[in-house]
Amino acid sequence: MIIEEALRSGKRVALPRVRGKRRMEFCFIKSPADLKPGFMGIKEPGPWCPKAPAPFKESLVLMPGIAFDRNGTRAGYGGGYYDTYLEGHAECIKAALAYSVQIAPEIPAAPADIKVDMIVTEKELIICSQDFREIR
């Protein structure tokens, strides 16, 4: 639904495609028809979809996770794909969509873990990064 609305409103949409162990790239899609089953059966852009450039300051990256804390630390799915991809591109906007039950008091973090700047739940917007405090 988010993807379809973004495409309908004229946004450029890039989605991840797994390229090997702990490696992924983002590729532009023009419609949901550009998606095919990929790694672990998750839909990803087909091989015909052009590769997107590295994220920049105005890029919004929606990061998945099992649980999050209010400092932006997330428990992912164990592959480190997003942490590896975003290494060196921390200036982009990193957000997560979650249910309020996914917000934990504290999530243990490793030095290589990339934090999210904000979390949107069905109940609130949690601003985790000092750079976005004025949004509240």
Could you tell me what each predicted segment is?
Residues 1-56:
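N-terminal active-site beta-alpha-beta segment that forms phosphate/nucleotide-binding
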Residues 78:
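Short polar/charged helix/loop
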Residues 35-37, 67-71:
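Short, basic, glycine/proline-bearing loop/turn elements
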Residues 46, 51, 56-61, 69-73, ...:
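Surface-exposed, charge/polar-rich loops and edge strands
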